[in-house]
Amino acid sequence: MKNLKKTSKPLFETNNKKVIKTPGTAPGTLVFTGKQKVSHVSFINTLVDGDDIKIIKNEHGDIDRIQEGKGMTWLDVIGIHDPEKIEALGEKYGIGKLILEDILNVNQNPKYIDLGNSNFVTFQSLFYNKNDNKINKEQISVFFNSSIMITFREDDSETFQPIYERLSNGNNRFHNRKPDYLTYAVMDLIVDKFLEATQYIDMKIEEFEVKIENHPDNTLKQDIFYFRRSFLEFMKAIPALREAIAKMKFSFNDFL
């Protein structure tokens, strides 16, 4: 029988240094409420011009160096802990202060907002991390219009690697589409990661069953407590994500 690790820690990576906005703060005040995970803001700038795909790394987050493709542009913002930098991006692309406030508030429920000429969606990505044997939680926000999609995240993870690979491998479905389709691809990827996390949860339940029957010890009660708390957090995220996706599908029936 395989050895089971003593967990005695939450199965989810949690944000232990939450920043709470001061009550009475004016709407649109930009405060990053999460834990800084990267040293500085950086961009991955993807230009789509038909069959011509260029992926440019902007390591220092230089806004003046951002390029835009003739067909479609994807700007992946890694690091949202710098409110001034995020505000400057908002000014460049016409993103309102209330939307920027939502981007920096990493502890909120998923939502979709139709802004008329542009759109905004934010959601929690829960994915299994093999390196630390936990389910990691990451907020991802997406602002998009007819020509550009901007994704915002704090962690320099490989969350979007499958999409970058599809772009690099010449996936024609992306070449002739607009940012709304790319946004849908991002959300589809997040749903897939939820399913992977579900498989991990199933595995942990089986481990607990074996441990209860064959290897009960003093840590079991605490392990189950942490697991239950993490599982409830996972289940809470699902209906909110489903609602955000449903609102997007209602607004974009032509491509979904």
Where are these regions (language model features)?
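Peripheral, non-transmembrane regulatory/ligand-interaction domains of membrane transport proteins
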Residues: 1-255
